[in-house]
Amino acid sequence: MGARNSVLRGKKADELEKIRLRPSGKKKYRLKHIVWAANELDKFGLAESLLESKEGCQKILTVLDPLVPTGSENLKSLFNTVCVIWCLHAEEKVKDTEEAKKLVQRHLGAETGTAEKMPSTSRPTAPPSGRGRNFPVQQTGGGNYIHVPLSPRTLNAWVKLVEDKKFGAEVVPGFQALSEGCTPYDINQMLNCVGDHQAAMQIIREIINDEAADWDAQHPIPGPLPAGQLRDPRGSDIAGTTSTVEEQIQWMYRPQNPVPVGNIYRRWIQIGLQKCVRMYNPTNILDVKQGPKEPFQSYVDRFYKSLRAEQTDPAVKNWMTQTLLIQNANPDCKLVLKGLGMNPTLEEMLTACQGVGGPGQKARLMAEALKEALTPPPIPFAAAQQRKVIRCWNCGKEGHSARQCRAPRRQGCWKCGKTGHVMAKCPERQAGFLRDGSMGKEAPQLPRGPSSSGADTNSTPSRSSSGSIGKIYAAGERAEGAEGETIQRGDGRLTAPRAGKSTSQRGDRGLAAPQFSLWKRPVVTAYIEVQPVEVLLDTGADDSIVAGIQLGDNYVPKIVGGIGGFINTKEIKNIEIKVLNKRVRATIMTGDTPINIFGRNILTALGMSLNLPIAKIEPIKVTLKPGKDGPRLRQWPLTKEKIEALREICEKMEKEGQLEEAPPTNPYNTPTFAIKKKDKNKWRMLIDFRELNRVTQDFTEIQLGIPHPAGLAKKKRITVLDVGDAYFSIPLHEDFRQYTAFTLPSVNNAEPGKRYIYKVLPQGWKGSPAIFQHTMRQVLEPFRKANPDVILIQYMDDILIASDRTGLEHDKVVLQLKELLNGLGFSTPDEKFQKDPPLQWMGYELWPTKWKLQKLQLPQKEIWTVNDIQKLVGVLNWAAQIYPGIKTKHLCRLIKGKMTLTEEVQWTELAEAELEENKIILSQEQEGYYYQEEKELEATIQKNQDNQWTYKIHQEEKILKVGKYAKIKNTHTNGVRLLAQVVQKIGKEALVIWGRIPKFHLPVERETWEQWWDNYWQVTWIPEWDFVSTPPLVRLTFNLVGDPIPGAETFYTDGSCNRQSKEGKARYVTDRGRDKVRVLERTTNQQAELEAFAMTLTDSGPKVNIIVDSQYVMGIVVGQPTESESRIVNQIIEDMIKKEAVYVAWVPAHKGIGGNQEVDHLVSQGIRQVLFLERIEPAQEEHEKYHSNMKELTHKFGIPQLVARQIVNTCAQCQQKGEAIHGQVNAEIGVWQMDCTHLEGKIIIVAVHVASGFIEAEVIPQESGRQTALFLLKLASRWPITHLHTDNGSNFTSQEVKMVAWWIGIEQSFGVPYNPQSQGVVEAMNHHLKNQISRIREQANTIETIVLMAVHCMNFKRRGGIGDMTPAERLINMITTEQEIQFLQRKNSNFKNFQVYYREGRDQLWKGPGELLWKGDGAVIVKVGADIKVIPRRKAKIIRDYGGRQELDSSHLEGAREEDGEVA
């Protein structure tokens, strides 16, 4: 304090208190300002004692001078204070701060001999010679530059700043001041001084790495440089990691192309510091709002504290102060602030708002409210006889207009007080039409229905109310059970408040008052002195006139004028009128009027007003993915023509409210460009939203496919309309708009680019389809409920309406839909409105009784590319839905393999023939028909050449649609398997389009199908069907028998191949002593096995037994293929067709064929009989009791598979049907599938562990959510379960099951019924469980007991699959293995990041480092190179590996201790 007290003494201190802070202000300097300035000097490494003299102040000003233009408010205040102290020391008389600054400027300018002003905006990085100031780089007299290290005072000031402010807003300008002119070496020295705050330092490092990478990408390395030439800096050079101080100085001050590496590096650090400031000060300036009762001064303090953390230009901060400070104030203060006029000073705002919210203001408000309440209400139309009182819109006072007002002009709208529009365009001044009573906060956004009195307020009594708009909402109310009328809530959904509530009770939720649309006259029925009259509600008429009624002789003659001229009327007063369930007494005239009208005198008495509800669709909140930021991509160059086109498009969109100008604080940008539309006359604007799509949250497509005309029910009338600018009618959430910013550049950079952001859904953004689909579903939902007899098909912006109504009624419902859409802000362009057939819709042409494809045009090319073929195939696939016989197999083969889109394609003869055949098919026009629910749906399948299939789905003789199938999933296949795939495709397609399965006509005999299906059934969904007699086109070609053929020769085959030389051998031996070997070249193991099998077929008789050890060969043969892409398999097929009977079996790797010993000694029939005869009988008893499978018998009794298979096959209850073909399912250890099945009138709930096949099942009393939840809880208490997959039955989707799953931590997923990829495992297990129950049913009385017995058999008596284990063994083994893996990983992770230095024997030198494998109590195990050593703990030093930067001794390990400087 001594130095601070000695700064100014006596007379100087008195003079200080006479100097004003501002020229026009009243506040003056005090000694507290000197104390504050002394504290601030320490941040810049300057001594407080410098303030005691004129020369010291001059030194301070020299340091602060270059920082003023970009400094904070604190820095500028410090500079001003030092200027005042300098003037006092120089005995210069000044009145205020501004005079002091000007005086200091003149004196210091004269001393330095320059005209440089004090607060200069820019200065060179290195000063001229002789003016070194505080710069680390200084110029010598010879013109060279030398480096002066940073002083300890500067580093200390930096560290103290970080410690005091904890990365507050002051850190960034402080860093700018202290690092002025520094090299990267000096900046790194400053960063290294910060010991704590390592999280912030890591953020800065990541920013440096990112910026360095961007620098390297934008500045590629040039070619070889001449000798002696200085290289250009890389990103790591700028960061100071790969460059020296001398190189940095040369880059900064070289004459040719200098690179300011210091300033660049400072900018990188500033970006990192700004990110840290935002992290440590998370409050956004936009979120700082004044509380309802918060004093204005406290709000201003919070505002400016947050404003300091915003690192933006001074102009932007000034804009924030002028707009946000007032905009975010509470309503009371905002009202006061707007009365201060344009751009009030902060002092004026603080003074004006000083008493706002206090008792005084509340008393004034209450007095005004009481005064208004005591004022009698005006008599209707009495004001028309008096002079109207003029009220000023600007100041609110009476007696003058806004033009004559002398008060400061209010900023923004004079109606609502908001900026951005004038009062004439204020949305709050808009009105809806004829609303009964006063409005709430939100106007109803949809047309209303009939009034509560029963009269249709929207139509004349003679017209049917069934077609009125009110029907939409009447039906919606009945569906929801509501009693009131539908209104639009703020969140965009529809609610139905109770009709019984009064207007005053509804408050801000809006009123369900009578509403009249303007597409026809608002005519109602009124009762005038009990006489019913139809009258027109006319807000443009002053008086009310009716004709044709008698109201007595007490009248006054009157002549009134109107559009048709003057008419004579009789004016009668005090007439009772009942209209819209309200009674009033008013004056009415009778006379010869062309139409009865109620004018404003009656409408006012009824409380009606003219309103225009502004339809608002609430935007859906959208966010970025966690941890992601918006796109910051530069705009690429565009041609002048495209720039002008984009400017015109953007100006039009801005006028229509679809775009708005982006503020200067928006840091995001996405490139934009333009392309010509199809007509080549207009341009289309495109935005490259790929980066924004990558960081935006994920969405779910609500509409998963395109509607098909064959699925439409047959209707008499069809209308198609289009929603114009569909995406641009849906608002984008305000918080997300900033990320859609884009820039329109100018030619030659003649002006700054104009930046826009989207206010609506942008084209090309991934969220637009999902949000649009969701919004349209909500908008159309009440219309669908109100018109259940009308078909409404909506796909994106195309809408189809079909009905059996009369022409007038159909047109009326279409008009209602258009009005509904128009009322919500959607446009329905007349040019795309289609009423008369043919109607163009989704690529189809529609008539009331049939549909066609729009005209197809196959491309004609001289030279075909891959892209051309793709387009051609796409057109043909589109045509295949109605043109039968379309083929594309050979066309697709033209582009098979890896080819570029522009690569030229060479046509084959087959492809040319296929194309010509398709052209002939397309030349004959085809028609499709609509679906009739009462008729049966049929599907007929036909096989074409080359395994291409055609099918048609029809009702009687009328074809709904056709299709083709040519996808061959296996290299070796047969017609029956392909037929099953075709049936499956048709079944899925029919479920999607019609919701039902057709009756199939299959070109196969029942016996052929059942023979293949019994031996090759699949765990996939195949719909049920009835066989219809058709010409059999599909048949199996060779006879595989299930049992060995007695008396036939038995062949044992094998093949092998050397992987390096690709040489192999195929061989066989027989039980009769024959053998054969064939040497193969350039082959594989699988090909050698097939060659051996083919040799066997060639050399064997008409009946043969073949034993193979290859599952590959076995799988091909038992699939009974009819054709294949493999030469050797086609040869096998041809040879097997010639055989009378073939028995094929598989045994695992009989080594005798491999050359070790003769195969006939290993697998001869005699050995099999002698070795296992005594074990066959116990195996048969075991099977009769438990019905164990073949693998279990083989494992438990050691009998051969052939014997075990025979035991199972001879059992009447266990007829084998082959092995299942399993698809790919999630087989993690915690995944279970659950389903309910029915047997003997009981409900059985089944749960299957997917990976092991372990089953849990029991009988439950009812298929409810509670019983399912109890079973799930019981299951989870026994076994680990993390994922449960079920179908979407009501019991599985119930709240009880969801609550149990949430409590246990189970992830739930649901599949679609009949989908083969959904719950195939549990569906198959239901089948197995029922079969097992049928085998042992007689062993128990109740179904509850037999279910548990069957579960025991399936879990413990059924062996096979992976590891040849039972499901119970497999599940326990999986759980044990998982625990062991976790234990080992946990142990290994303890040693993963440690290295060991060690000593061996008497050698005192430390060796290593080695990798730590294990740490025991007395020794450690170390891996050194390929050797593993055991080292005593006392001779080992364990060190954590920190990537070569830091080391920790073993004291950081648990149980470590130090002895004599060594780690034990």
Swiss-Prot record:
Residues 533-602 form the Peptidase A2 domain. Residues 1224-1375 form the Integrase catalytic domain. One of its GO terms (biological process) is establishment of integrated proviral latency. A motif (Nuclear localization signal) lies at residues 26-32. The record marks 135-136, 366-367, 383-384, 432-433, 446-447, 513-514, 612-613, 1051-1052, 1171-1172 as: Cleavage. It catalyses: Endopeptidase for which the P1 residue is preferably hydrophobic; Endohydrolysis of RNA in RNA/DNA hybrids. Three different cleavage modes: 1. sequence-specific internal cleavage of RNA. Human immunodeficiency virus type 1 and Moloney murine leukemia virus enzymes prefer to cleave the RNA strand one nucleotide away from the RNA-DNA junction. 2. RNA 5'-end directed cleavage 13-19 nucleotides from the RNA end. 3. DNA 3'-end directed cleavage 15-20 nucleotides away from the primer terminus; 3'-end directed exonucleolytic cleavage of viral RNA-DNA hybrid; DNA(n) + a 2'-deoxyribonucleoside 5'-triphosphate = DNA(n+1) + diphosphate. InterPro entries: Aspartic_peptidase_AS, DNA/RNA_pol_sf, Gag_p24_C, Integrase-like_N, Integrase_C_dom_sf_retrovir, Integrase_C_retrovir, Integrase_cat-core, Integrase_Zn-bd_dom_N. The active site is at D538. Gene3D superfamilies: 1.10.10.200, 1.10.1200.30, 3.30.70.270, Acid Proteases, HIV Type 1 Reverse Transcriptase, subunit A, domain 1, Human Immunodeficiency Virus Type 1 Capsid Protein, Immunodeficiency lentiviruses, gag gene matrix protein p17, Integrase, C-terminal domain superfamily, retroviral. Residues 514-518, 562-568, 601-613 are annotated as: Dimerization of protease. The record marks G223, P224 as: Cis/trans isomerization of proline peptide bond. Residues 1045-1168 form the RNase H type-1 domain. Zn(2+) binds at H1183, H1187, C1211, C1214. A motif (Tryptophan repeat motif) lies at residues 1009-1025. This is Gag-Pol polyprotein. It comes from Human immunodeficiency virus type 2 subtype A (isolate Ghana-1).
